[in-house]
């Protein structure tokens, strides 16, 4: 660095530091500002002319150019700028001379110091070079000794490593036997490090050792995986899952450990398990473990002590040893770089292991209780409501399902713990976690659903319903027709044949054969045919311990609910969006699968218990009435269902609607029975007079009012009855025997009526209306709500010797109903009441048809009413009528209550009055002997009616007696009766008949005299008195018509006034 040395001329500048005044500092700054302004001017005004690349010669030539393109015109400006810059530079130098001198002095000092350092460095370099030359003097013997030493040292290291390597496999075997997996992992790691040593890698004799280490690593991995599965799925006794989950529950449900002295105590404790509390206790261990890991994330510790094996943060709860042990094993697997493989294996084996939990639990029951299970095969035929709680097999099954669901619960808790450990051991930045918990969760729910299907879905119900689905609102509808697929399958074993031929059976046999050859394989309608390989994770369906039934839910519900509640928050928050929760799964299954099975079961039980029986089979009721056995069968079934579903204490809308649908089904069954019994309602297809009367709306309204106690409509009823048969007294125009019910049909209708009355005696009393506050929001799902919604009780042990016991003697059975359900229940009750009304009305019509038939026959068969000799004999038709009435009354008395019996006979005397009066039109000639005969028959008939009636004083046939008595009197007496209104229900035509019969004998004699004269048949007989009386009746008819019109107008005005007044109010 000699070039830094300055020339030695004159004196050296001294270094001095003087402080500047404010004025000096301002002057220095001002000079610099002026110079800066000059430079800025150059940059702005001369930037295109003056630049770093400007050629001075070219610039000088441009200033000499006076043309318009030259710079001659700016030459003066350039000189002025030059002078100005020079002046300003001089000012800067003058103002900054002291600072400049100081800087120059400093520079001199620095150059001097650098030169001294260079001299010292050069001396040091020379010394080092001389020392190096002395050290590197050739020493041949020393180099040889050094080389040999290095060679022998390396050889000794290799031998030590080989000796250590040869001992590692044996140490690994010993530690594997002791299950000291952490030490095994350390030894393997050391062995692979030694094998990767360059000095050992080329040794051929050590290659088997390397292979042995790889096999031991694989063995270690398999042992770790197996122990993880043993812990998760409770295969070994190392981790007692009953202590890890909840020791209290197993004390309650376990028969061998509960210590109960009686079955009642055991059942009481089973029923009163607090699911919410136990679920919190069970989840406490997992929550504590997850909390500990979140607090100690990244602080991974390993302890080989079996009591506190903790790969991650050691939990304070010793009951977490299962989770800790799994964590330790996973950490060991992670240390051998096989954690992703382990996660895949755990995920793929999950379905099989979950299925094995169920299989092993059920097989344990089969091996322990084979005789009880044999008895269970006949259970379905003996009891359609599942195992009774008193049955020891029911208790065994409860324990079995508790064990299954608790093991499944512990398994999924372990999987959740693995998920948390995976985030610590193998964190990932992607959205997909390393451990596929959601996939395992889905497999677990699938297995639970298959378990429920195995014990709940009865194949007989599915086949018996033939695919028809009845919605909850009550109406039975067929399943909706699905649209045809756009891309139908090319081939399917069961659908390649159009008809149900024998070839189709062969197709099913082929499917069965494939299933036998390949266990677990089933030909599915949605099989993937893109590959010849079967990709199926399903298992061959296991035989259930007891016949499947919806009532098996009694032993499944509580453990299922505990599992559901305990796993309600087990799905990690990052997976909840696309994963179904346990509570949602439970609710969906119960509503979409289990509830339809309940409805199908009810329909099946109704078919088996009611519909399949002879509808006309009889049984004695508690009132000794013969009623249909189907009514008693339905009551027994209905009582059992109400008791099983606990309708007296809990209102469950969907269950209630299923029960109401069943009740409506029973009503429709009886309605169909009624229609088939009475016959078609089409008047064109049946000539029965009763059918015609049933179709008469006005008449049916009158019957309704009469049965409700209105006794003012008997005359109007009679008018409507005879509208269909106005000429009943004429041969060929009246009723025949075919219009009446035969004895068998009559007895059946009586029994039907008694059955409906018996049903209405107990059914309406079951209803108990309640007020339900509607909640605007959907209530949150929890175990307590779900338990109250789906809990079953036990079926009733009804006394078959007296199955029609009253509800009071059967535990005060009720069915709680809200407003909507009450209306549906009332509609069914109204249907039965309508059925009762029709049956009672039919009995009324039948007995009236009998009276009309016999009275009509009485007039048709009596040809002479003007006999010469009087007779007191009773007409055979009237005698037959009285005999039939007495026999019918006896049957009614035996079958129906007194009220209904009386309602059938009430008003019958009015109908007879009407028939006897209208039948007078068939009498041509009537004398006093004929009148006596008629009055004799009417009097006997009236006496018979009074004997049949509970209120004899109300039986009045005086109208008929007066009618025929007047036939034997004068016209003056007739008009006197009319004046006194003693013939209120006789029409003008009836009065004309009286007049005709009063003069009939005289007219008959006149006709006889004319027949003997020459004017035979030319002149009709006439009577002045008769003609005047007829004219007087005609005038009276006109006056009555006017009076009747006035009366109708008055009534109409009164109604309009009443309506107007009501509207004003």
UniProtKB/Swiss-Prot annotation:
Transmembrane segments: none annotated. The modification Phosphoserine is found at residues 16, 19. Residues 1006-1065 are annotated as: Disordered. One of its GO terms (cellular component) is plasma membrane. Residues 1025-1046 have a biased composition (Basic and acidic residues). Pfam families: Sec8_C, Sec8_N. Residues 114-148 form a coiled coil. GO terms for biological process: endoplasmic reticulum inheritance; exocytosis; Golgi inheritance; Golgi to plasma membrane transport; protein transport; vesicle docking involved in exocytosis; vesicle tethering involved in exocytosis. Component of the exocyst complex involved in the docking of exocytic vesicles with fusion sites on the plasma membrane. This is Exocyst complex component SEC8. It comes from Saccharomyces cerevisiae (strain ATCC 204508 / S288c). The lineage of its organism: Eukaryota, Fungi, Dikarya, Ascomycota, Saccharomycotina.
């Amino acid at each position: 660095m000699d070039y830094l040395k300055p020339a030695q001329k004159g004196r050296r500048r001294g270094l001095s530091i003087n402080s500047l005044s404010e004025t000096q500092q301002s002057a220095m700054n001002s000079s610099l500002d002026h110079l800066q302004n000059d430079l800025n001017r150059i940059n702005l005004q001369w930037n295109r002319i003056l630049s770093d690349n400007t050629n001075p010669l070219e610039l000088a030539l441009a200033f000499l150019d006076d043309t318009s393109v030259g710079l001659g015109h700016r030459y003066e400006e350039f000189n002025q700028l030059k002078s100005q810059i020079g002046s300003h530079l001089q000012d800067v130098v003058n103002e900054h001379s002291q600072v400049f001198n100081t800087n120059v002095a400093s520079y001199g000092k620095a150059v001097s110091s650098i030169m001294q350092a260079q001299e010292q460095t050069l001396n040091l370099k020379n010394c080092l070079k001389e020392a190096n030359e002395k050290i590197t003097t050739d020493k041949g013997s020393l180099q040889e000794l050094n080389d040999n030493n290095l060679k022998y040292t390396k050889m000794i290291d290799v031998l030590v490593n080989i000796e250590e390597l040869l001992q590692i496999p044996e140490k690994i075997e010993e530690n594997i036997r002791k299950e000291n997996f952490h030490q095994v992992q350390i030894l393997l790691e050391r062995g692979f490090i030694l094998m990767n040593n360059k000095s050992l890698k080329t040794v051929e004799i050590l290659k088997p050792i390397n292979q042995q280490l790889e096999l031991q690593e694989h063995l270690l991995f398999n042992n770790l995986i197996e122990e993880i599965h043993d812990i998760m799925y409770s295969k070994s006794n190392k981790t007692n899952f009953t202590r890890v989950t909840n020791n209290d529950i197993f004390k309650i449900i376990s028969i061998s450990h509960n210590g109960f002295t009686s079955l009642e105590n055991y059942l009481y404790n089973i029923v009163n398990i607090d699911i919410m509390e136990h679920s919190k206790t069970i989840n406490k261990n997992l929550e504590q473990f997850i909390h500990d890991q979140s607090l100690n994330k990244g602080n991974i510790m390993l302890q080989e002590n079996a009591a506190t094996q903790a790969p991650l943060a050691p939990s304070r709860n010793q009951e977490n040893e299962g989770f800790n042990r799994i964590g330790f094993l996973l950490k060991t697997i992670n240390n051998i770089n096989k954690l992703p493989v382990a996660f895949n294996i755990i995920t793929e084996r999950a379905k099989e292991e979950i299925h094995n939990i169920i299989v092993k639990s059920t097989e344990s029951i089969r091996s322990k209780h084979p005789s009880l299970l044999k008895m269970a095969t006949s259970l379905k035929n003996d009891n359609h409501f599942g195992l009774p709680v008193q049955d020891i097999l029911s208790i065994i099954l409860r324990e079995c399902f508790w064990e299954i669901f608790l093991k499944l619960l512990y398994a999924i808790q372990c999987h959740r713990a693995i998920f948390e450990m995976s985030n610590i051991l193998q964190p990932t930045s992607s959205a997909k976690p390393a451990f596929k918990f959601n996939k395992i969760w889905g497999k677990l729910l699938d297995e639970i659903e298959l378990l429920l299907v195995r014990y709940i879905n009865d194949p007989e119900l599915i086949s018996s319903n033939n695919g028809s689905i009845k919605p909850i609102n009550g109406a039975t509808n067929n399943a909706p027709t699905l649209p045809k697929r756009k891309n139908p399958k090319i081939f399917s074993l069961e659908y390649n044949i159009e008809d149900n031929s024998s070839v189709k059976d062969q197709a099913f046999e082929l499917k069965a054969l494939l299933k036998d050859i390949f266990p677990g394989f089933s030909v599915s309608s949605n099989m993937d045919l893109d590959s010849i390989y079967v990709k199926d994770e399903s298992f061959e369906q296991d035989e259930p311990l007891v016949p499947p039934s919806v009532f098996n839910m009694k032993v499944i519900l509580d453990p299922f609910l505990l599992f559901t509640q305990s796993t309600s928050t087990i799905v990690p928050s990052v997976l909840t969006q696309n994963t179904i929760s346990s509570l949602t799964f439970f609710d969906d299954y119960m509503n979409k699968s289990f509830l339809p099975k309940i409805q199908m079961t009810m329909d099946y039980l109704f078919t088996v218990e009611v519909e399949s029986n002879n509808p006309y089979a009889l049984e004695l009721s508690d009132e000794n009435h013969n009623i249909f056995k189907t009514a008693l069968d339905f009551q027994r079934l209905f009582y059992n269902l109400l008791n099983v579903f606990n309708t007296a204490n809990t209102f469950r809308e969907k269950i209630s609607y299923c029960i109401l649908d069943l009740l409506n089904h029973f009503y429709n069954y009886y309605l169909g029975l009624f229609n088939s019994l009475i016959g078609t309602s089409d008047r064109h297809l049946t000539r029965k007079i009763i059918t015609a009367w049933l179709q008469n709306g006005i008449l049916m309204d009158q019957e309704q009012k009469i049965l409700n106690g209105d006794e003012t409509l008997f005359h109007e009823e009679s008018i409507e009855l005879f509208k269909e048969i106005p000429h009943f007294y004429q041969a060929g125009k009246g009723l025949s025997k075919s219009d009446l019910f035969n004895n068998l049909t009559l007895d059946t209708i009586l029994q039907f009526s008694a059955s409906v009355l018996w049903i209405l005696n107990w059914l309406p009393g079951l209803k108990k209306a309640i007020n339900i506050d509607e909640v605007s929001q959907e209530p949150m799902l929890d175990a307590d709500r779900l338990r109250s919604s789906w809990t079953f009780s036990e079926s009733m042990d009804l006394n078959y010797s007296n199955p029609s016991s009253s509800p009071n003697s059967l535990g005060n059975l009720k069915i709680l109903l809200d407003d909507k359900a009450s209306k549906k229940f009332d509609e069914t009750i109204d249907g039965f009441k309508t059925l009762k009304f029709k049956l009672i009305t039919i009995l009324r019509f039948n007995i009236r048809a009998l009276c009309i038939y016999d009275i009509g026959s009485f007039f048709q068969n009596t040809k002479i009413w003007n006999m010469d000799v009087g007779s007191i004999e009773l007409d055979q038709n009237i005698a037959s009528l009285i005999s039939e009435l007495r026999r019918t009354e006896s049957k009614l008395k035996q079958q129906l209550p007194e009220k209904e019996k009386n309602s059938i006979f009430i008003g019958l005397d009015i109908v007879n009055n009407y028939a006897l009066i209208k039948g007078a039109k068939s009498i041509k000639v009537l004398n006093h002997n004929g009148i006596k005969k008629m009055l004799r028959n009417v009097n006997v008939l009236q006496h018979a009616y009074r004997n049949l009636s509970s209120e004899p004083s109300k039986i009045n046939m005086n109208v008929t007696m007066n009618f025929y008595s007047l036939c034997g009197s004068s016209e003056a007496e007739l008009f006197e009766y009319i004046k006194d209104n003693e013939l209120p229900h006789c029409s003008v035509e009836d009065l004309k008949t009286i007049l005709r019969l009063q003069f009939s004998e005289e007219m008959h004699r006149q006709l006889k005299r004319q027949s003997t004269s020459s004017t035979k048949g030319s002149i009709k007989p006439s009577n002045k008195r008769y003609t005047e009386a007829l004219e007087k009746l005609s005038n009276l008819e006109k006056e009555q018509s006017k009076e009747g019109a006035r009366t109708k107008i008055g009534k109409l005005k009164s109604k309009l006034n009443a309506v107007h007044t009501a509207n004003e109010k």
